[in-house]
Amino acid sequence: MKVMKFGGTSVGSVNSILSVKRIVESASAGEPVIVVVSALGGITDKLINTSKMAATGDSAYEGEFREIVYRHVEMIKEVVPAGEGQVALQRQIGELLNELKDIFQGIYLIKDLSPKTSDTIVSYGERLSSIIVAELIKDAKWFDSRTFIKTEKKHNKHTIDADLTNKLVKETFSSIPKVALVPGFISSDKTTGEVTNLGRGGSDYTAAIIAAALNADSLEIWTDVDGFMTADPRVISTAYTISELSYVEATELCNFGAKVVYPPTIYPVYHKNIPIIIKNTFNPDGVGTVIKQEVSNPHSKAIKGISSINDTSLITVQGLGMVGVIGVNYRIFKALAKNGISVFLVSQASSENSTSIGVRNADADLACEVLNEEFAKEIEMGEISPILAERNLATVAIVGENMKHTPGIAGKLFGTLGRNGINVIACAQGASETNISFVVDSKSLRKSLNVIHDSFFLSEYQVLNLFICGIGTVGGSLVAVSYTHLTLPTIR
């Protein structure tokens, strides 16, 4: 048995959703499959925007809602054959859309949008799409993920209750049909039963939770790319698909900006040693990327991929009053954690007089506020400088488990950056040597990615196109020297 997850782009158009039908029906011919689907491409954003418009009293929300209705109604007409099945599906989808219409109207009238109502609204995206796909695929049976994906509230956030969820998943799928169809992303509170969700990208997480609970043979994530790439192909034209990654490498790449897999997805299947296979719905015969415990070629390239986070702010806590003082870093990270601020990079001077942390731009102001409050006494006494954020930065990470076996990687990396005039503002490397990350000015990001990719992934030999105008003393000597170094074919 395997679990297959299809993202929004995979169910976003008539052609793509028909491709999903072919892929699933082919897979289910040999074994039972559980299929997890996202909302139709772009619908989640449209639901959120429509909610916000209604909450501000903007009557144009009605036009946005009509577009949501149109997308689903037209999809049914295009992919489901005319007849009783189509009529029944239109009725079922119509009921859900009417519920959604009433919710939007209520928000518009009271001009208020609570988090609970927002969670309810975005759940309709996956509920609508999964019901349509279930009708489209032969022998598919629909299951409501709200009945078995359970969350609890911790630190004002909804998190999975793993024990209860695993128990309910096993009970729900004690007998697996040929095709089980499940809406991704959505869940419910274990105490109140209220609709919750697993966050953007949560459909990947839904699929991983189910795969782990049922000890699936594999988890397939079908998306609109061929797998993990050596770098962002939109920036690096020579980037290519990585055939294999370890769980650790995939996690590092995801944490530093690669959006192929939602980061929390990896742990549940890693714990059960279930391989994750990334495939392209639009190129189903492509090789894709396999994520597993151990790669089959341990002597492959030292680094597997390059990832980046463009919206970086660097916050530095510094001052001579920090030197030799125990607990400064503890206070930094405790204050940030208490306010829900995630830190993805830490760099500390060996003299202990400064610690720099990388956060998302959206968290920078709050991070400065809470740290200035935490160290208010030290700042007033001049022991620590006022804490400010350095903005318009980008973080780049090179990732690969083989780096720990290869000397000179850091030297090659920073040498490449230096030769190309790129200034490194901060850097960090864990003791595991799986990741080297550094911060640069955001204007240097594209150049950084290109020169690093050329250095680590292209041929050891660079091709130079040399043009000589005239063969005088200098030109003639250059031609003669070049000729003596040519490797000529052997003539038999």
Protein language model regions, located:
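A conserved active-site cap/scaffold subdomain adjacent to cofactor or substrate pockets
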Residues: 254, 262, 267-291, 310-314
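Short, well-ordered alpha-helices that flank and scaffold nucleotide-derived cofactor binding pockets
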Residues: 22, 135, 454, 480-483
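A conserved regulatory-domain signal marking ACT and ACT-like small-molecule sensing domains
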Residues: 285-480
